């Protein structure tokens, strides 16, 4: 059956104490609403309607997509009123209502819920809690059939004793939702149009209300303040850590690992503490990542080693390559098989061939370095003249002496060597030694100045 999804994302979130709309606050590097939209897309609906209000333009700009239709709720008059704003755009056989501040909901849970909705049956996602304070209560009859949802503020003492709460996530037959929304009233403690009142209307019309529960109650946890936001973050990260460990990854401490994007992992991967993975990261078999590393949009081939306190972005490390500690690989960095980048080496838009080495204290920008070449400590590729960037190209088996400045554009042939302390401004032919430094002069009998 066809499906329309409505995501309610109009709330201000005053308890966040922020100029940023609540649904744009991030969990694992992505806005809460972004997580919900990604889950909605996984269900392959006919349309996704996003109801926005507070900070509407910010939300629209941040999350614009060809498959999203944004509907503005000018006044926040309740969840029923919010869904009503999307009514002109709903024509599918089923309508699923989601919330933009409930980022951990799983597509599998929603699939189970949707299997229970039909022309004569609604499907409601509920959760059983030890303390359901704040949740609307699920009122059932003697046969266990759902009769109504009573909001916490409107509930009697007996109703507040009910532990089964309403998550707000609801799937309804598309042919009936318009009729029910048109009959909503705001005669309640909040003076709002409650979407939950649809349940009692459906029961009165002879429809059955089926229920489903998530495997984990945290799936339906929202965030009204930064404390709850932090709880969502930590739960998301622990869930991600468990998934990685199930795929053969060793995490030294799952509580000190952050995934802020997507990662593909091989087997026998070792990740030490305080590692952050961002964007899209590919980690192949037998990779080792030391503590305190940040890796973004990068690929680590089989057996690569990232040592402590290294930062990688847009980089590729070949099989058996290693970098760090304290290495920085910026976008466009490519390390060949068994290449080595040591401490305090920065690379940008540069490639290091198979077996090549840059041991320490170097900047390699806009450079191509051939296989088995050795870059001495303190080497700088001078790639910028104040207006344009230029490349340095080295052949295979090149040896760059320590403290060399290579002024681009520059080509060094296979087997070329530069003497330590040289400033190289002209191309160096293959198998040639280049020296570009002042001649040393020793002054006999010289004495240091003394203070006066």
UniProtKB/Swiss-Prot annotation:
Cofactor: Mg(2+)
Any GO CC annotation of this UniProt entry: membrane
Binding site for Mg(2+): 101, 224
Active site: 360 (proton acceptor)
GO BP field: cell morphogenesis; cell wall organization; lipid A biosynthetic process; peptidoglycan biosynthetic process; regulation of cell shape; UDP-N-acetylglucosamine biosynthetic process
Spans annotated as Pyrophosphorylase: 1-226
SUPFAM superfamilies linked: Nucleotide-diphospho-sugar transferases, Trimeric LpxA-like enzymes
Start and end residues of each stretch annotated as Linker: 227-247
Record's keyword annotation contains Transmembrane helix: no
Matching InterPro entries: Bifunctional_GlmU (IPR005882), GlmU-like (IPR050065), GlmU_C_LbH (IPR038009), Hexapep (IPR001451), MobA-like_NTP_Trfase (IPR025877), Nucleotide-diphossugar_trans (IPR029044), Trimer_LpxA-like_sf (IPR011004)
Cofactor binding annotation: Binds 1 Mg(2+) ion per subunit.
Described purpose of this protein according to its UniProt entry: Catalyzes the last two sequential reactions in the de novo biosynthetic pathway for UDP-N-acetylglucosamine (UDP-GlcNAc). The C-terminal domain catalyzes the transfer of acetyl group from acetyl coenzyme A to glucosamine-1-phosphate (GlcN-1-P) to produce N-acetylglucosamine-1-phosphate (GlcNAc-1-P), which is converted into UDP-GlcNAc by the transfer of uridine 5-monophosphate (from uridine 5-triphosphate), a reaction catalyzed by the N-terminal domain.
Family: In the N-terminal section; belongs to the N-acetylglucosamine-1-phosphate uridyltransferase family.
Record protein name field: Bifunctional protein GlmU
């Amino acid at each position: 059956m066809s499906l329309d999804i409505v995501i309610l994302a109009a709330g201000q979130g005053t308890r966040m104490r922020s100029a940023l709309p609540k649904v744009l606050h991030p969990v694992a590097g992505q806005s809460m609403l972004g997580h919900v939209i990604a889950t909605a897309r996984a269900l392959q609906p006919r349309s996704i309607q996003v109801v926005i209000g507070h900070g509407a333009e910010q939300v629209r700009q941040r999350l614009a997509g060809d498959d999203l239709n944004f509907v503005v709720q000018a006044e926040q008059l309740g969840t029923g009123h919010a869904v009503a704003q999307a009514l002109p755009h709903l024509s599918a056989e089923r309508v699923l209502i989601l919330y933009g501040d409930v980022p951990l909901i799983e597509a599998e849970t929603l699939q189970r819920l949707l299997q229970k909705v039909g022309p004569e049956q609604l499907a409601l996602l509920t959760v059983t809690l030890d303390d359901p304070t704040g949740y609307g209560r699920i009122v059932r009859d003697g046969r266990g059939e759902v009769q109504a949802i009573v909001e916490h503020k409107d509930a009697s003492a007996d109703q507040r004793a009910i532990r089964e709460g309403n998550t707000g996530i609801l799937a309804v037959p598309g042919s009936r939702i318009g009729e029910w929304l048109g009959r909503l009233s705001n005669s309640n403690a909040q003076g709002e149009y409650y979407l939950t009142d649809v349940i009692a209307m459906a029961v009165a019309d002879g429809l059955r209300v089926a229920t489903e529960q998530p495997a984990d109650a945290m799936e339906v946890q929202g965030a009204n303040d930064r404390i709850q936001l932090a709880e969502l973050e930590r739960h998301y990260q622990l869930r991600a850590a468990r998934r990685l460990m199930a795929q053969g990854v060793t995490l030294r401490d799952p509580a000190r690992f952050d995934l802020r994007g997507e990662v593909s992992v091989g087997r026998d991967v070792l990740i030490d503490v305080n590692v952050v993975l961002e964007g899209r990261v590919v980690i192949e078999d037998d990779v080792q990542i030391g503590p305190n590393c940040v890796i973004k949009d990068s690929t680590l081939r089989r057996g690569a080693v990232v040592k402590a306190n290294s930062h990688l972005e847009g980089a590729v490390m070949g099989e058996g390559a290693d970098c760090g500690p304290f290495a920085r690989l910026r976008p466009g960095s490519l390390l060949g098989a068994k290449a080595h980048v040591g401490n305090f080496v920065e690379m940008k838009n540069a490639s290091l061939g198979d077996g090549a080495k840059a041991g320490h204290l170097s900047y390699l920008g806009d450079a191509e370095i051939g296989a088995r070449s050795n870059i001495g400590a303190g080497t700088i590729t001078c790639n910028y003249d104040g207006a344009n960037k230029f490349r340095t190209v080295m052949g295979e088996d090149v040896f760059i002496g320590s403290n060399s400045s290579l002024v681009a554009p520059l080509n060094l042939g296979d087997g070329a060597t530069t003497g330590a302390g040289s400033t190289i401004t002209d191309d160096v032919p293959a198998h040639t030694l280049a020296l570009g430094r002042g001649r040393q002069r020793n002054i006999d009998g010289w004495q240091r100045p003394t203070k006066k």
